[in-house]
Each structure stands twice: as structure tokens, then as C-alpha cells.
Amino acid sequence: MLMRQKGIIIKAVDYGESDKIITILNEHGAKVPLMARRAKKVKTGLQAQTQLFVYGLFIYNQWRGMGTLNSVDVISQHYKLQMDLYVSSYASLAAETIERSMDEGDIAPYNYQLLQFVLEKIESGTSAQLMSVVVMLKCMKRFGFTASFNRCAVSGNDTQADLIGYSFKFDGAISRQEASKDVHAVILSNKTLYLLDVLQKLPIDKMNSLNIHQEIIDEMSEIILMLYREYAGMFFKSQKLINQLKRLEQ
């Protein structure tokens, strides 16, 4: 059966000497794996069209199991995402988070909206690292956990100025008054906790200007990755590349 669907490539894996297996997140919010034959060969014209983040109309044959890609009518290559290794890596982290949050057969229209929003924001100049944080905050429930950043998990104190870190012992933010009860709590700036709470709750269509200091973004990114490791056992391939890039700069 010949299928035509708009979508965004969220995963691309080399298969053999000349083929690729790509996964698109289609406009309905479903993951569609496709075999792209000879996609690594320049002459086929599919090499550029099967890169990560390509948004287009995908035409493919599907009977049972994996479909076979025929052609792609590209709407956007998202070139700006490919021009900087850090930008590309954090955009990949966002895409990987969404891809791994979905099981085969899941339909999640919101994930498609989230991915489109994030890629457009990154292309317009918003920090790719910050947008990866937004994605990971929005996808937490799909990985089976949540996190609270606006009240002390020990006392219930919701005075934002009193919150000084995150406690894995008590599974939530912790206030300075209760800090002695968890000496291993991760110390975070009050602003980091506040912005994590805001970004977690704010609908994406209300996120207009996102100008946050880099030190705060770094703190948010670090604690989010810790939450995913602790509560979901998740390690991201994209983050490994980011860590390697950071080590090279030291």
C-alpha cells in the first residue's frame, strides 16, 4: 500500500553498506520506521533527505512491519541545526527523548507538536540545550515519573526563596530549614528550581521569549539528566557525544 505522510525524522541508523533505517514521527504522532534503500549513495538523492530533523512529505510502501521509503518531498532540512555540533547534539537529545518515550504503536499528537515547536525555536536562535530541557520536562510522565520543584518534599514549605536543592532521598525539592535531613541533596540555585517549575507547567504555546542565563541552563540540564538516570534508568546516546565534546574543550 502506498502511503503519504508528513513527518520529521527523529532517528536514522546506518544499515549495511548502502542502506539506512529511519524513523519518522508523523503528523498524527505515530512513529513510523522505514527502510531507505541505497540512502547512503549520493546518486540516489536520498542521502540529504534522510538526515535527522528533515521535515517533509514521506512517500513509502507498507504492507506488514517496516515500510520501504520511495521518496521525500522536503519541506525543511533544518540546516541551522546541522551547522554547530553542540546545537545538533542537543537537538538530537530532544529527538531521542521523544523517540524513546514512545512504544511501538503509541499515538502521541502532542509529541509531534512538541518536536515541531522545539526545532523551530532552536532554528530561531533559542538555546538548543534549553529546548532539550523543555522536552525532558514535558516527557517525564511518559517515562513513568514526575518531579516537584516548587515545595519542600519534607515540610511542604512552598516559599520559593527557601528552596535550595533537590533531594533524591525525599524525591523532591528541599528547603534550607530541612537541608540537614539529606546531606546528599543536590544543591541548586533558587532561580533554577523556580524556572524548572515554570517550564514544567507552562504550555508550549505560551513559551514566547526564552532568555535564560547559561549557568542556570547548565544546572537545569544536569539535574534533569540525574532525574532520568535515577527514576527511569535512562542514559542517552546524544548526551554521551555532548560529554565528549565538553571533555575536548577542557
From Swiss-Prot:
The keyword DNA damage appears for this protein: yes
Signal peptide start and end residues: none
UniProt cross-references to Gene3D superfamilies, sorted A to Z: Nucleic acid-binding proteins, Recombination protein O, C-terminal domain
UniProt keyword terms in alphabetical order: DNA damage, DNA recombination, DNA repair
Entry GO CC: bacterial nucleoid
Tagged with keyword Transport: no
Pfam families (alphabetical): RecO_C, RecO_N
Functional note: Involved in DNA repair and RecF pathway recombination.
Family, as annotated: Belongs to the RecO family.
NCBIfam families: reco
Name by which UniProt lists this protein: DNA repair protein RecO
Naturally occurring in which organism (per UniProt): Staphylococcus aureus (strain bovine RF122 / ET3-1)
Gene encoding the protein: recO
